[in-house]
């Protein structure tokens, strides 16, 4: 199992002064650039520590929000591709459907892959609804635009015999010829995220690494949809390396201290949805079917524990988050057991996206959290034998 450390790089000093929305409309006068600089340096120091500890790195981007200062993920990738030496660098993700110029995306990511000497994992995502005001995109066209941008980027990265032209619905180019060419052949590994069984099946058909974020014990349903898509396309079961899950992680030698850390990290969940209602679900962003499920209360923010009990992940405590597989929290032995139980429930999982820092967790607490995890949990996760993929797939197909 690989483990990637992730933080939203939040500007948390303003979390208690938001006037009802931390996203889109929060005035940037509430951001002190000197404080922001200190926070950025702190977050990069923690990523450098991960490189030393054998933990890989995950970055993302969001816009116009105090929940995430990383508004351009390639800036973080550029910094980390130079100051780290061993860690894989995962971008999860890059909202390519929002971008005006996928050629620039192909050039940026190709350059990052070269500077890092082949350590880039590139995750392409649709993006959350709060991003639409910043990009001014039509939400009804977003997925079509996403897949055209995806197809163009892959073609640009894999064409090595001169220029080509592109005439699509959204993008038009002449004489495309990306320099430098990517380090990894034919291109860096592709990841994506979803909370939809339909989209999970599509990702399975493409063979991409699929990540789910905060889906708890509902993750197995999404993994099985992926397995069906993958088996239908490739005629074999997908390996555990095709599956990833983002979970909050708080570990300490003392159980009480671990719970304190877990509660601080869970501040990410409590603040991420503080946004004015009009920005939460713009018309056309999701399908009519998914909107109907939301109205019936069948989709997040509700999560589900292993026994099927529903919880609101944005307004609950540490115990419920542990029971739902959203938070792995406790002593090293407890955290290891929780992660393995979750992996077994899902039929295998090769990539843990570990939110080992969030919210008000201090630098000192974060360093201890990451260091203890790397010494007493990570080696056992790497040594753990995944469930037999073919046996899991046969059970899904039965």
Model regions and ranges:
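N-terminal beta1-alpha1-beta2 module of alpha/beta enzyme domains
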Residues: 1-87, 188, 391-398
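Conserved, mostly hydrophobic/aromatic
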Residues: 3, 61, 80, 112, ...
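Hydrophobic faces of well-ordered beta-strands that scaffold small-molecule active sites
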Residues: 3-7, 57-59, 89-92, 120-124, ...
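An alpha-helical appendage that flanks or caps ligand/catalytic pockets
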Residues: 4-31, 52, 143-179, 219-346, ...
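Active-site mouth loops of central-metabolism enzymes
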Residues: 25-41, 93-103, 184-194, 249-252, ...
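Acidic (Asp/Glu)-rich catalytic clusters
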Residues: 48-52, 77-86, 109-120, 204-205, ...
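Glycine-rich, proline-tolerant flexible connector loops at the mouths of alpha/beta enzymes
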Residues: 58-76, 96, 130-133, 214-216, ...
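A conserved active-site cap/scaffold subdomain adjacent to cofactor or substrate pockets
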Residues: 195-223, 227
């Amino acid at each position: 199992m690989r483990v990637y450390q992730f933080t939203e790089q939040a500007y948390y000093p303003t979390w208690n002064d938001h006037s009802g929305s931390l996203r889109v409309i929060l005035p940037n006068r509430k951001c002190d650039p000197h404080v922001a600089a200190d926070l950025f340096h702190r977050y990069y120091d923690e990523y450098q520590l991960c490189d030393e500890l054998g933990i890989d790195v995950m970055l993302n981007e969001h816009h116009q929000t105090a929940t995430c200062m990383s508004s351009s993920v390639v800036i973080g990738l550029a910094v980390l591709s130079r100051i780290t030496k061993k860690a894989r660098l995962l971008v999860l993700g890059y909202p390519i459907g929002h971008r005006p110029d996928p050629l620039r995306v192909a050039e940026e990511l190709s350059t990052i892959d070269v500077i890092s000497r082949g350590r880039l994992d590139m995750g392409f995502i649709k993006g959350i609804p709060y991003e639409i005001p910043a990009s001014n995109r039509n939400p009804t066209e977003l997925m079509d635009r996403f897949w055209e941008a995806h197809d163009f980027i892959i073609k640009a990265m894999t064409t090595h015999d001169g220029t080509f032209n592109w005439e699509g619905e959204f993008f038009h180019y002449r004489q495309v010829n990306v320099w430098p060419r990517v380090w990894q052949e034919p291109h860096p590994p592709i990841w994506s995220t979803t909370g939809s069984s339909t989209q999970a099946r599509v990702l399975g058909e493409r063979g991409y690494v699929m990540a789910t974020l905060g889906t708890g014990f509902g993750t197995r349903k999404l993994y099985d949809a992926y397995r069906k898509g993958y088996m239908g396309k490739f005629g074999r079961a997908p390996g555990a390396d095709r599956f990833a899950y983002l979970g909050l992680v708080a570990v300490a030698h003392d159980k009480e201290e671990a719970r304190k850390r877990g509660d601080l990290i869970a501040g990410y969940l409590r603040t991420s949805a503080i946004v004015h209602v009009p920005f939460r679900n713009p018309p056309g962003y999701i399908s009519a079917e998914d909107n109907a499920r939301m109205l019936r209360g069948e989709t997040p923010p509700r999560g589900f524990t292993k026994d099927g009990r529903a919880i609101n992940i944005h307004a609950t405590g540490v115990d419920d988050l542990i029971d739902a597989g959203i938070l792995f929290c406790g002593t090293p032995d407890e955290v290891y057991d929780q992660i393995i139980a979750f992996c077994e429930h899902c039929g295998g999982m090769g990539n843990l996206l570990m939110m080992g820092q969030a919210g008000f967790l201090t630098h000192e607490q974060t360093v201890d959290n990451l260091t203890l995890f790397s010494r007493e949990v990570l080696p056992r996760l790497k040594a753990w034998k995944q469930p037999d993929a073919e046996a899991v797939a046969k059970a899904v197909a039965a």
